[in-house]
């Protein structure tokens, strides 16, 4: 499978690069994607939610009224869960939402996400990102040249590049990350994925 290679001016270089079929050309596995995204979203949760149960409420323990004959529900003290301001029954407690996911499943999910992008013509390969200094204007110009300025953009670099990161930081819908941080959720959430030629080589090393 071959795709055209562009430069950051949006010009076709006349060269093509071959995408690895075992990564970019597989039949996407939706269940693997679901599990990987579920784990990612679960790991974003702080898990610090907490409500007070009956033993944790401070207040009088005097019984409000007689047990029978009042015509209403039986209730004890002011901390009763049936009263406004009372305790909560089986309320949330601090917990860790992490769950284990096998490495093979995560790898399959990432391959599936990238394959979806290829199937939807939402993957662009560029020669390289050469930003001499952090400049938002240059990054915006690049998105316009590639005709992706109106889409959520994910730029995947082979390694960290401070100039590119800082140039894209203030642009809504633009996200920059390295191959080592390749993430199924972010790939799927992007309207277009932009890779460099070196990024493709790095992805081959990680996902094969």
Curated annotation (Swiss-Prot):
InterPro entries: Ribosomal_uL4, Ribosomal_uL4-like, Ribosomal_uL4_dom_sf. It comes from the Bacteria. Residues 44-79 are annotated as: Disordered. Pfam families: Ribosomal_L4 (PF00573). GO terms for molecular function: rRNA binding; structural constituent of ribosome. One of its GO terms (biological process) is translation. Keywords: Ribonucleoprotein, Ribosomal protein, RNA-binding, rRNA-binding. GO terms for cellular component: ribonucleoprotein complex; ribosome. Belongs to the universal ribosomal protein uL4 family. One of the primary rRNA binding proteins, this protein initially binds near the 5'-end of the 23S rRNA. It is important during the early stages of 50S assembly. It makes multiple contacts with different domains of the 23S rRNA in the assembled 50S subunit and ribosome. Part of the 50S ribosomal subunit. This is Large ribosomal subunit protein uL4. The gene is rplD.
